């Protein structure tokens, strides 16, 4: 094999992309991964890390460009770790994401006949985030900086704009940054674990335009909070809630468990279809509201509700998808391990006068067995777990429940594919639809339909 040495400069042709969007060049059979390179490009690159089984390269020059290459519109793209695909046309991004799902499911397990649909994309794949979590720090000259982390680090890149964030969030960020400097409010230092302001979090209701601003602080004492509240109220009249979240932990967790309302309401409202949701500072709510409606509509299509079905919504959170389906179901049962989320789900059901809903707090595998013993037989089960996927205990319990259809929403197709192999014992994985919830990034969301084998 040809010798591979660190700091060596080489040329080669990109033959594939990794799940991180990195170009793959092979020397003999040895893979080299190069960020920002595209398939079929002839490139010059420098080897910056060499391991036994792979190497990492840095792109120096594109000798022969792909038709899929575009100039990234963001001035921070080369440094910021928030986006990975701005150098790629949006059509190519959608194709890449579908291809990754195809590779996962058609090459592993009994899923070669599963239909993988085209990725559902956005008309305008920018400014889509309804929630911004912005780290706060200080420069070497002790000026307040706000932005996002440099790739693979906790170094904050001071930014005035971000093209995937809501435009209003940027305006709030820039004004708060100015006021923190003006008022000389202390900023949290990750190394010394001292200082007050850790993060600024902004949430907006996509359909209501209500805005919530959250100051995440290292401790409860926030002497100048009233000054900041008054400035925000005056400059941004659509702010309906300002909160302080206390996070004393010395970890990468952004928000703590304790919050207090400094101004306005405890929650903001948003709508999906005809359903209104109350969203708190700690609520899980999909980041991309317009794509969430497409995601949930596809899930609804797979569920094929006629009004006679009992629906079980596992990992239900604040009830978003269960309440979305409730108007078309006989009854919706939701289960979630987080007590506050269940309270929010019940409040949301009451707000929308959806009386055909029941929510219970507990582990899904325990609660659904209790419901089964009470004679509750769901025809459709909704599954929407965190990135780690489903616990095996839950999946084996789900097989005992034996519903006709399972609709599985995933933010991590790798764990979805792992879980699908367990469900394949009794279910046919009929179809998967990727939905692009996070344009310009490598993240993929999918919704999959499983049908009981005796129902095919």
From Swiss-Prot:
Belongs to the class I-like SAM-binding methyltransferase superfamily. RNA M5U methyltransferase family. [4Fe-4S] cluster binds at residues 74, 80, 83, 162. Its EC number is 2.1.1.-. Residues 3-61 form the TRAM domain. S-adenosyl-L-methionine binds at residues 286, 315, 336, 384. One of its GO terms (biological process) is rRNA base methylation. It holds the Pfam family tRNA_U5-meth_tr. The keyword Electron transport does not apply. The lineage of its organism: Bacteria, Bacillati, Bacillota, Bacilli, Bacillales. SUPFAM superfamilies: Nucleic acid-binding proteins (SSF50249), S-adenosyl-L-methionine-dependent methyltransferases (SSF53335). It comes from Staphylococcus epidermidis (strain ATCC 35984 / DSM 28319 / BCRC 17069 / CCUG 31568 / BM 3577 / RP62A). The active site is at residue 411. Keywords: 4Fe-4S, Iron, Iron-sulfur, Metal-binding, Methyltransferase, S-adenosyl-L-methionine, Transferase. CDD domains: AdoMet_MTases. This is Uncharacterized RNA methyltransferase SERP1435. GO terms for molecular function: 4 iron, 4 sulfur cluster binding; metal ion binding; rRNA (uridine-C5-)-methyltransferase activity. Signal peptide: none annotated.
């Amino acid at each position: 094999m040809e010798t591979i040495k660190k700091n060596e400069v080489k040329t080669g042709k990109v033959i594939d992309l990794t799940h991180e969007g990195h170009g793959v060049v092979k020397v003999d059979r040895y893979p080299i991964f190069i960020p920002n390179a595209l398939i079929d490009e002839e490139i010059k690159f420098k080897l910056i890390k060499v391991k036994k089984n792979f190497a990492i390269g840095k792109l120096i020059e594109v000798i022969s460009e792909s038709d899929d290459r575009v100039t990234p519109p963001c001035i921070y793209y080369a440094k910021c770790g928030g986006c990975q695909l701005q150098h790629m046309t949006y059509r190519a991004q959608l194709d890449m994401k579908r291809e990754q799902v195809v590779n996962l499911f058609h090459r592993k397990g009994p899923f070669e006949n599963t239909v993988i649909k085209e990725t559902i994309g956005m008309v305008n794949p920018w400014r889509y985030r309804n929630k911004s979590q912005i780290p706060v720090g200080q420069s070497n000259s002790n000026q307040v900086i706000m932005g996002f982390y440099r790739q693979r680090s906790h170094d904050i890149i001071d930014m005035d704009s971000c093209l995937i964030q809501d435009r209003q969030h940027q305006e709030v960020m820039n004004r708060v940054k100015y006021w923190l400097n003006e008022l000389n409010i202390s900023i949290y230092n990750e190394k010394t674990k001292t200082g007050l302001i850790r993060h600024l979090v902004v949430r907006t209701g996509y359909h209501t335009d209500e805005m919530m601003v959250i100051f995440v602080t290292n401790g409860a004492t926030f002497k100048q909070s009233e000054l900041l509240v008054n400035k925000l109220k005056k400059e941004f009249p659509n702010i309906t809630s300002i909160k302080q979240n206390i996070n004393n932990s010395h970890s990468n967790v952004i928000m703590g468990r304790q919050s207090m309302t400094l101004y306005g309401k405890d929650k903001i409202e948003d709508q999906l279809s005809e359903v209104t949701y109350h969203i708190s500072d700690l609520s899980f709510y999909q980041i991309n509201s317009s794509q969430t409606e497409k995601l949930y509509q596809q899930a609804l299509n797979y569920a094929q509700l006629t009004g006679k079905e009992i629906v079980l919504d596992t990992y239900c959170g604040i009830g978003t998808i269960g309440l979305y389906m409730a108007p078309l179901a006989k009854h919706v049962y939701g289960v979630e391990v987080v007590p506050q989320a269940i309270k929010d789900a019940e409040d949301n059901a009451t707000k929308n006068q959806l009386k055909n809903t029941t929510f219970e707090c507990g582990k899904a595998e325990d609660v659904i067995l209790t419901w089964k013993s009470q004679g509750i037989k769901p025809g459709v089960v909704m599954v929407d777990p965190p990135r780690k996927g489903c616990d095996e205990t839950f999946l084996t319990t789900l097989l005992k429940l034996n519903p006709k259809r399972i609709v599985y929403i995933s933010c991590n197709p790798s764990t979805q594919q792992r879980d699908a192999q367990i469900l394949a014992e009794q279910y046919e994985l009929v179809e998967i639809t990727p939905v692009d919830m996070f344009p310009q990034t490598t993240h993929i969301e999918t919704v999959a339909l499983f049908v009981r084998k005796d129902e095919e």
